[in-house]
Amino acid sequence: MVLATLAIQKGALFIGTNPDKNIPTERGLLPGAGSVVTFVETATQTKPVYIGKPKAIIMERAIAHLGVEKEQVIMVGDNYETDIQSGIQNGIDSLLVTSGFTPKSAVPTLPTPPTYVVDSLDEWTF
């Protein structure tokens, strides 16, 4: 983090992969990339440019790389703020798996619901 802070202060482009504050692990929630980005943002007083979920660039590049249409894709994830928002913001169907970061109890209050919701990937059939 020290090297990143010094580089940004000297004019380096500040790129963040994603704004995930936490990542779920077997041991509980641990700091995610967004926590580190926020630390560096505070230290440098510089806003990052995000290139990962939920930004369009990552979805557009993935779809182009696969050579498919949006209608043939579904965004699967356990984090509403990044995974599912990637689908919603980019016109792609989404499947929220509630066994990870976003709990099932949060689904009724989400501002824009995912296309599909399952408790576990074991329930997903296509």
Predicted regions: what they are:
Residues 1-126:
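Asp-based, Mg2+/Mn2+-dependent phosphohydrolase catalytic module
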